[in-house]
Curated annotation (Swiss-Prot):
PROSITE patterns xrefs: PORPHOBILINOGEN_DEAM (PS00533)
S-(dipyrrolylmethanemethyl)cysteine: residues bearing it: C241
Keyword Ribonucleoprotein: no
Keyword Transferase: yes
Top enzyme class: transferase
Name of one Pfam family that matches: Porphobil_deam
Gene Ontology cellular component terms for the protein in this record: cytoplasm
Gene designation: hemC
GO biological process: chlorophyll biosynthetic process; protoporphyrinogen IX biosynthetic process
UniProt keyword list: Chlorophyll biosynthesis, Porphyrin biosynthesis, Transferase
Lineage start: Bacteria, Pseudomonadati, Chlorobiota, Chlorobiia, Chlorobiales
Protein's name according to its UniProt entry: Porphobilinogen deaminase
Length: 312
């Protein structure tokens, strides 16, 4: 058994929370392990002046950490799963999918009002094309403003009056104890989350069997089935973090229900569909994701995504 483990992580408050949570859980199961953190600055942390959709690079928040992992400078990397591209680099694998937090998105507004009750032409901040597309399909009057930076930075900009409302993932808001600022939690029939939202992905080297065995104690089988289905759908659509695709899987009593959305950035075109099938393994879940992706492509998703890629 290893005596030491080094966890690679970004240095944002949320990333540190996630890494410390992972460290605490692993220490609980393996008290003899000496576990330390190595902080890594990623491209996404440095390039804060441009919208994420304009940078055009998958793995903005993961690539630099993965370099340290491949170089054996760290033993594992802890990511927000929604930031992890569906094609992991050769030699690396997501070995553990942690139990998922609430996957929904939330509205934080000056008035305390929810999405339907925001004033006409309200300024809404989000860095996500997925959120933008779904927002504009319901409220085409909204002025969508790009926002970058960690959660604390976003709340400061909000408190300084730079916009009227902002949309964030519930999981991050809850983990950093900003829940009292929430104006509305949006249900999935209004706003589908990003693929993998609410879960952590623990990445290891494929040849490091000992570390894989260690981190598997944190794996939640329901979360793995849902997230692998979602990631298979995203992979089949050749989408990434900055494409307007939303997806959510729920797994109850051996049945997987997968909801998915593909839309144009302006919100004028929105495709939604769902698929429910019995599933026993992560591989079967991935097949459901691919099948639903094919349904969306037959509905016209290919043209929507091609048009978006032309403008990037």
């Amino acid at each position: 058994m290893k005596k030491e483990l080094i966890i690679g992580t970004r240095s944002s408050p949320l990333a540190l929370w996630q890494a410390e949570f992972t460290k605490a859980e692993l220490s609980r199961h393996f008290p003899e392990l000496n576990i330390t953190l190595k902080l890594v600055k990623t491209t996404g942390d440095v390039l804060l002046d441009s919208p994420l959709s304009k940078i055009g690079d998958m793995g903005l928040f993961t690539k630099d950490i993965e370099k340290h992992l491949l170089a054996k400078e760290i033993d594992l990397a802890v990511h927000s799963l929604k930031d992890v591209p569906t094609g992991t680099p050769e030699g690396l694998v997501i070995s553990s999918f942690t139990k998922r937090e609430d996957t929904r998105d939330v509205i934080i507004s000056k008035s305390g009002k929810g999405l339907k009750d925001l004033p006409p032409n309200a300024r809404m901040a989000t860095s996500s094309l997925r959120r933008m597309s779904q927002l504009l399909s319901m409220r085409p009057d909204l002025q969508i403003l790009d926002i970058r930076g960690n959660l604390n930075t976003r709340f400061k900009k909000f408190d300084d009056g730079e916009f009227d409302a902002m949309m964030l993932a519930y999981a991050g808001v809850y983990r950093l104890e900003f829940s009292d600022r929430i104006s509305e939690i949006l249900p999935h029939d209004v706003m589908l989350p990003a693929v993998g939202q609410g879960a952590l992905g623990i990445e290891t080297r494929t040849d490091d069997a000992e570390t894989i065995e260690i981190v598997r104690v944190m794996n939640d089988s329901n979360t793995e089935i849902c997230c692998r289905a979602e990631r298979a759908l995203l992979r089949h659509l050749q989408g990434g973090c900055q494409i307007p695709i939303g997806c959510y899987g729920s797994y109850i009593s051996g049945t997987l229900k997968l909801l998915a959305f593909v839309g144009s950035v302006d919100g004028k075109t929105a495709l939604r569909n769902e698929l429910t099938k019995p599933v026993n393994t992560p591989e079967e879940a991935e097949a459901v994701g691919i099948e639903l992706a094919e349904v969306l492509l037959s509905m016209g998703a290919e043209k929507i995504l091609a048009d978006i890629r032309k403008t990037r």
